[in-house]
Design a protein with these regions (language model features):
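Glycine-rich flexible loops
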Residues: 2-206
């Protein structure tokens, strides 16, 4: 298991550059986005590690002007509110920088979401969960990033691009991040597609 220190670095306090435009969002988070986020929270796939005070997991959808993503350290909030999301309006993978607008910052994990959206323009929704059992089970059985590559880094974004070139990730719509303890992302043309992929795998665990 990771030490606390590694976990803190991993969750990105904040090893990336953020240009945060702190103002209320003009757009409100779609109902479906809030519903799927709360469903994942109820299933403990998105949440908060109380002992080290760090949130895990997040969810995003493409929208006009960028993508809406649950903000940093919102894992313990339930039910989620529209203002717990932030709009990523710009990013630069190579220098690990993000511009976001809203009342909350985007975490470094936004970079991985940006890479998935960039890799396949038909993708409109992404869910990132933590599940130790499923993570171990699916490792190398579904498209899997290299173990030495940490989450929320330019290297991870490049790993995502590699998987889209070299694997059937477009069909499978799920990625295990070997270098991000317990981390799994699913995606699809909408949240229902991304969510059902995860629910199907979770059902097999029981």
């Amino acid at each position: 298991k990771m030490s606390n220190q590694e976990h803190i670095i991993d969750e990105g306090y904040i090893k990336y550059n953020i240009n945060w435009i702190n103002e209320p969002l003009k757009v409100s988070a779609p109902k479906q986005l809030m519903e799927w986020r709360d469903k994942m929270h109820e299933l403990k796939q998105i949440g908060h590690y109380a002992e080290i005070n760090i949130g895990y997991g997040n969810i995003s959808v493409k929208t006009d002007g960028g993508f809406l993503i649950s903000g940093t350290q919102t894992g313990d909030i339930y039910p989620i509110k529209s203002e717990d999301f932030t709009l990523v309006t710009d990013y630069n993978i190579q220098v690990n920088s993000v511009t976001c607008k809203g009342e909350i910052k985007a975490s470094s994990e936004s970079m991985t979401h940006a890479a998935v959206y960039e890799a396949d323009k038909s993708i409109n929704a992404i869910i990132h969960i933590h599940n130790p059992k499923l993570w171990s089970l699916l490792m190398d059985k579904v498209p899997t990033t290299k173990k030495e590559v940490p989450y929320g880094t330019p290297e991870m974004a490049n790993e995502i691009f590699r998987l889209f070139k070299e694997t059937k990730v477009k069909e499978e719509k799920i990625i295990v991040m070997a270098g991000h303890d317990e981390g799994i992302i699913s995606f699809g043309k909408d949240l229902n597609e991304a969510g059902k992929i995860l629910l199907n795998f979770l059902a097999k665990l029981n």
